[in-house]
Amino acid sequence: MTDNVSRADLALKWDLCDHCLGRVFAMVGTGLTNDERGRSARADVERERGSRGEVLPPHERCWLCGDIFDSVPRFADAVIRSLSKIEHNNFLIGTRVDPEIQEKEERLWSEVGQDTAEPIKAELNREIGKIVEAKAEKPVEFDTPDVVALVDTRFAQVDLDVSPLFIYGRYRKLVRDIPQTRWPCRMCMGKGCERCSFTGKMYQTSVQEIVGDPIQAVAEGTDHFFHGMGREDIDARMLGNGRPFVIEIREPKKRNLDLGSLENLINDSGKDRIEVIGLRPSSREEVRKTKAASPNKTYRVVVTVHGKVDEAKLNEVLQSFKRTRITQQTPVRVSHRRADLAREREIVDLHLEEIGEGSFTLVLRTEAGTYVKEFVHGDNGRTRPNLSEALGAPCEVRSLDVIEVNDDTSEE
């Protein structure tokens, strides 16, 4: 008697269906289903016992699974009904089984070994998936499925775990005093109070809401999350090529969206406040890349100077700052939410764009993470060197615009 026939003979001291018997040998050979392996193993045991004058009792009801595999078509139909309620391009099956079944399976393995065995849930997932794939004409996707259909085999109940929808784009913020993301009221923490006129928000709207609300509505999702490549100050505009972002829509019922129409819808509803460009499908991996990116940025800054500064001196000072590294202690204005650390940042390039009475306009490109306002006014000596100190005259930022995000991380 071969080792595998011996193991099958030992396994059949319990009344097992062909699926549960064959699953003991799931890793032996290729090209067969577990059901086929089980039939073959059963025939081998019948011959072996027959040679000893013994008879294998006829199969009645599987001791291990209770003949659960007879219900696989019913489970598959339940999955198809559930999946028909949402738009998806692919799927994956998961299952729950009675804990007693798993306990019996482990008992079987302890007797006959599990080196070549496969768990019952793996076979159920595969067999249900094969039927759904054929009937629904949608492929199984193991790595990044649009939806996981979780079948509770005790009740033939199906729960759907719908993957988020990710959409990449770039936004321009054409006005000041709009935050990038929803900002809960500091007084009530979003519950609603007199301070926030019972909206629960510090600001009436945000880039996230102007962009995310229309997409969520069209996708019929339950919520949205905004992942930006950094963020500008609330009082700064974001112009030029726009800031990259990925919007994440939770539990979307629709996935195949007309992004060109959505772009127009967002820009129309933005009402000259927010524009989006280049909407396209994205991924969780691109969210990670977007949030981790640290691109240089180019700014246009209107500076008020308290004192007389001639253009020649100003140009000389600006020239001296090119490729200069500055040290910035955490600014006072953000010290309540940032650790008090000294950070070195590079002023990559800067030049004078315009000069007037008591003010000038500066264009500068800086390393990611540079506090531009503090570079201008010095933050009471917490940023050095700084423009005010170099000019010998106090300077303040009147307005600041981001005019380019110099990134190269976008997926093509």
Describe the residue ranges of each PLM region:
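Non-catalytic RNA-recognition surface used by pseudouridine synthases
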Residues: 1-412
